């Protein structure tokens, strides 16, 4: 059998003091459940294509 991949949404969250903390930004157009990809100089949404540049 193939090796199991560690994927899924759980890698976008971290648990601190019994509470979950989001590690990525959420797309302002798509809403909850759609995380933005982190790049060196920007954040981008893979669904709608929204790009936010870092200051």
From Swiss-Prot:
GO terms for molecular function: structural constituent of ribosome; zinc ion binding. It comes from the Archaea. InterPro entries: Ribosomal_eS31, Ribosomal_eS31_arc, Ribosomal_zn-bd. Its cofactor is Zn(2+). Zn(2+) binds at residues 27, 30, 45, 48. The keyword Zinc-finger applies. Keywords: Metal-binding, Ribonucleoprotein, Ribosomal protein, Zinc, Zinc-finger. A zinc finger (C4-type) spans 27-48. GO terms for biological process: translation. Pfam families: Ribosomal_S27 (PF01599). Binds 1 zinc ion per subunit. SUPFAM superfamilies: Zn-binding ribosomal proteins. GO terms for cellular component: ribonucleoprotein complex; ribosome. Part of the 30S ribosomal subunit. Belongs to the eukaryotic ribosomal protein eS31 family. This is Small ribosomal subunit protein eS31. It comes from Cenarchaeum symbiosum (strain A).
């Amino acid at each position: 059998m193939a090796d199991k991949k560690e994927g899924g949404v759980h890698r976008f969250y971290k648990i601190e003091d019994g509470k979950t903390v989001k590690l990525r930004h959420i797309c302002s157009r798509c809403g909850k459940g759609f995380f933005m990809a982190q790049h060196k100089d920007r954040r981008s949404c893979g669904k709608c294509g929204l790009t936010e540049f870092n200051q």
